[in-house]
């Protein structure tokens, strides 16, 4: 008796379904790709309960004949390829003949189809891969496939499913990618009777992008184009100012097929160069037309992994196309728009009134074009400069660079009349104007400063500057070279981090609400996770298609950072499934410290340079900037003697060798 048997076809299809049909979105992908291959110009996707109860795809394509219909449920039966040579010039999205049999084996499937050559169509009903009904019916040209009770006979896969909202988000993402890949097809996605996505099918990629990401996003996207003998690259990329926190908005299409490719993603980022902020990614839709002989799509059942010949040449084409397109643009953002962070609103915004709520945090002074920290009563009595570097001597006539905010700036522009306030530095925390809470904060600050004073950071004696970029100082361990930008970036980062670390849970009403647009999948995911945003004081309400409205904002989020701040918090939530004010404010501190620090080629007077080194010595970590770059390097006396060959590697003196 033999131990090896040939598996029944239904069982083999169920095994194949484990690879092909991972979730309801996989079914939508396979059925829609079949509809596209059938030369459809209109495709409607209807789902119930995120596809677990029902998925229905209707198209106006070529349809199937009565004879071909039962063959479509046979494994490896396909009309896409006929011979081995066809495998190397595939231009259709499907070709394996696995998708439909796999789907049918784990669901109840109903197919209605008709071709334009016949007067009647056909109906097929199958459950678990077994055909129950096959008969002639009257139906329009095209195909309608309904999949019901998905995974009913594979409970392990059904148990693996995430929430309905998460599965719906995957379906929306699949339809969006296919819409971008085929703008000539009009797509409609309906979930539980509600329309989520609709594209016009005009063939205009830019119009398809507007239908998915919104008109405001599309306005900030640039067309790119490049070609050689093997590849044609075209598409749209966002301006450097329009970015997201993850790569999910980067869409790469090869011959109308959405693919994932790490090297091509890197080529896109290389095209932007240093124009992108660290950790930010552009919105990109790139269409690559390639000879099928140079692309092997027969790698994985999902066909999202494609091996491309001459990949390095293609990477260079993409990078060049993006960089050349950006060169032709004025990348300086609109000053008022950048200041107000109000790119998502379609109307002029009157000045917001401030509620009489006491808070501390970062504010922006448009007259001084600088940020300042608005303090409570503590700061009005004890200036911050007393704690960090002592009072600043403004009598120096040469150009000076502000290392930390002056005491006048600390209390804000509305309090400039308080310039005569006491400048005394109290050595004790028992001050009559300090309440218990502020005494504790001040005590903690003094304790921290005392500990910082005991740091092992070397005592440095400044003596010069090179190229307006590097400071030179000497200490007992030799020569120290300090990057002045990195040094002040560290100083300002720790300053801002402390000042914005605490937040107020109060809310302030907005006179004019903000509108926030998201892609369909992000919109659905955010609805599911809205409770987490509510916990940090962000209350978004659904307002139209893929749009939220914000009617009030948390006090810890200042007026000028509402638009960017809400988007940042939403991106953080989508990326990490959690939202943290602390993380957001830390990132804000890094950004502000970089923008407000001394730049290269900026000469410092001796006083400012020495003051910067004093403040650097008081930092918790004076050795690296917030981005991780070194702040200073050291040449010991022995290193210098080696470089000038005053000593040999074996430490034998040149004098001892009789050469000095």
Curated annotation (Swiss-Prot):
PROSITE patterns noted in UniProt: DNA_MISMATCH_REPAIR_1
InterPro entries: DNA_mismatch_repair_CS (IPR014762), DNA_mismatch_repair_MutL (IPR020667), DNA_mismatch_S5_2-like (IPR013507), HATPase_C_sf (IPR036890), MutL/Mlh/PMS (IPR002099), MutL/Mlh/Pms-like (IPR038973), MutL_C (IPR014790), MutL_C_dimsub (IPR042120)
Record SMART domains: DNA_mis_repair (SM01340), MutL_C (SM00853)
Record's GO cellular component terms: mismatch repair complex
CDD domains: HATPase_MutL-MLH-PMS-like, MutL_Trans
UniProt keyword annotations, A-Z: DNA damage, DNA repair
Gene Ontology MF annotations: ATP binding; ATP hydrolysis activity; ATP-dependent DNA damage sensor activity; mismatched DNA binding
Gene3D superfamilies: 3.30.230.10, Histidine kinase-like ATPase, C-terminal domain, MutL, C-terminal domain, dimerisation subdomain, MutL, C-terminal domain, regulatory subdomain
Family per similarity comment: Belongs to the DNA mismatch repair MutL/HexB family.
Protein name: DNA mismatch repair protein MutL
Source species: Streptococcus pyogenes serotype M1
């Amino acid at each position: 008796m033999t131990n090896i048997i040939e598996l029944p076809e239904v069982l083999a299809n169920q095994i194949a379904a484990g690879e092909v049909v991972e979730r309801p979105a996989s079914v939508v992908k396979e059925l829609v790709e079949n509809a596209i291959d059938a030369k459809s110009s209109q495709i409607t996707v209807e789902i119930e309960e995120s596809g677990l109860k029902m998925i229905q795809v209707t198209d106006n394509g070529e349809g199937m004949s009565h004879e071909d219909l039962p063959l479509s449920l046979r494994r490896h039966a396909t009309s896409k390829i006929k011979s081995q040579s066809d495998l190397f010039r595939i231009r259709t999205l499907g070709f394996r003949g696995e998708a439909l049999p796999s789907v049918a084996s784990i669901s109840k499937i109903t197919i209605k189809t008709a071709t334009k050559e016949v007067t009647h169509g056909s109906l097929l009903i199958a459950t678990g891969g077994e055909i129950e009904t096959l008969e002639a019916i009257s139906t329009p040209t095209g195909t309608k496939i309904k999949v019901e009770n998905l995974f009913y006979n594979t409970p392990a896969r059904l148990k693996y499913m995430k929430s309905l909202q998460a599965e719906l988000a995957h379906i929306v993402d699949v339809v969006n990618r296919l819409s971008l890949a085929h703008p000539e097809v009009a797509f409609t996605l309906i979930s539980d009777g509600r329309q989520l996505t609709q594209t016009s099918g005009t063939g205009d990629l830019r119009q398809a992008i507007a239908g998915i990401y919104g008109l405001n996003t599309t306005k900030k996207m640039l067309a790119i184009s490049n070609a050689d003998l093997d590849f044609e690259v075209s598409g749209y990329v966002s301006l450097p100012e329009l970015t997201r926190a993850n790569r999910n908005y980067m869409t790469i299409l090869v011959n109308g097929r959405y693919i994932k490719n790490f090297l091509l993603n890197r080529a896109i980022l290389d095209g932007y160069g240093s124009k992108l902020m660290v950790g930010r990614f552009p919105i990109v839709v790139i269409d690559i037309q390639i000879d099928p002989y140079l692309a092997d799509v027969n790698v994985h059942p999902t066909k999202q992994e494609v091996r491309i010949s001459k990949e390095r040449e293609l990477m260079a084409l993409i990078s060049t196309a993006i960089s050349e397109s950006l060169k032709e643009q004025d990348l300086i953002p609109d000053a008022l728009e950048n200041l107000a962070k109000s790119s998502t609103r379609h109307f002029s915004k009157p000045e917001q009134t401030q509620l009489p709520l006491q808070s501390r945090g970062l504010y922006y002074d448009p007259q001084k074009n600088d940020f300042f920290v608005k303090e409570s009563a503590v700061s009005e009595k004890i200036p911050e400069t007393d704690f960090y570097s002592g009072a600043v001597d403004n009598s120096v006539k040469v150009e000076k660079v502000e290392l930390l905010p002056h005491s006048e700036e600390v209390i804000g522009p509305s309090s400039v009349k308080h310039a005569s306030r006491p400048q005394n530095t109290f050595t004790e925390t028992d001050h009559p104007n300090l309440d218990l809470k502020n005494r504790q904060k001040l005590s903690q600050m003094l304790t921290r400063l005392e500990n910082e004073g005991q740091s092992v950071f070397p005592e440095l004696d400044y003596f010069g500057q090179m190229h307006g970029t590097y400071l030179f100082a000497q200490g007992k361990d030799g020569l120290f070279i300090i990057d002045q930008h990195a040094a002040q970036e560290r100083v300002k980062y720790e300053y801002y981090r402390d000042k914005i670390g605490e937040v107020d849970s109060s809310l302030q009403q907005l006179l004019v609400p903000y509108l926030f647009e998201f892609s369909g999948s992000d919109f659905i995911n955010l609805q599911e996770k809205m409770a987490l945003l509510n916990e940090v004081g962000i209350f978004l309400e659904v307002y139209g298609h893929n749009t939220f409205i914000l009617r009030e904002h948390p006090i810890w989020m200042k007026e000028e950072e509402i638009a960017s701040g809400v988007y940042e918090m939403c991106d953080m939530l989508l990326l990490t499934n959690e939202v943290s004010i602390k993380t957001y404010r830390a990132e804000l501190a890094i950004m502000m410290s970089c923008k407000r620090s001394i730049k290269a080629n900026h000469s410092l007077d001796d006083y400012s340079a020495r003051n910067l080194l004093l403040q650097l010595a008081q930092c918790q970590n004076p050795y690296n900037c917030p981005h991780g770059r070194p702040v200073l390097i050291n040449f010991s006396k022995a290193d210098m003697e080696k470089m000038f060959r005053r000593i040999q590697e074996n430490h034998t003196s040149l004098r001892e060798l009789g050469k000095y």
